[in-house]
Amino acid sequence: MKKTLKFIKKNFLWLIAFAGLIIFTFIVRRLFTNNISYIDSFVYDNIKWLICPPLTQVFKIITEFGNFYIMTFILIIILITGKDKSFKKYFTINYGLVALLNVFLKSIFERQRPVDINLIVEKGFSFPSGHSMVSFAFYGFLAYYIYHSNLKKPTKYFLIILQGIIVCLIGLSRIYLGAHYFTDVIGGFSITAVYLVLYIKFVYQNQLAKEKEVK
């Protein structure tokens, strides 16, 4: 039991990436065989009864936290006020890379958006969800930085959990508003888990290399 827990702790990020890859592959295989609608229909049937004007307004606000302009605004604030030049560089690169990855993947799959619910008007293809991918990478990398910061543990965990909740709510908002299918959102989260782990490992190795150079 102790060995198992030690293995999980040591390889936690790689296990997340592996799980993300499996989920993404599962969804993609069913996309190509047109055998995925039952999953999206099941989720839609359990969400549609929640639709009401007040909740719609709430989710329209929540979804804006994954909006390009809002996240770019947050990025600019961090670039202006942040003191860690290394973090600012990697944070900006991360934002650009995941956006490009989303455009690339959408151009491959060319899945059309849902037509059953149209509480918000969106353009472009549906899979994988751009809001899900970019928000997960954006807030996820920010959470990684916070985790390794000098903040007190309660503050760290509060901010990390808060960002996790925001990302999940952004994903839910995309389904509720009819901008994406359930599998678009899960697909976006899963492939970003793979990307983010690889990117974090890359950043970590770069930082180690620089520390060795200084020594």
Residue ranges and their predicted role:
Residues 3, 8, 118-215:
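Membrane-embedded catalytic cores of phosphoryl/pyrophosphoryl-handling enzymes
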Residues 18-22, 91, 95-99, 189, ...:
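Alpha-helical transmembrane spans of integral membrane proteins, capturing the lipid-embedded, hydrophobic core
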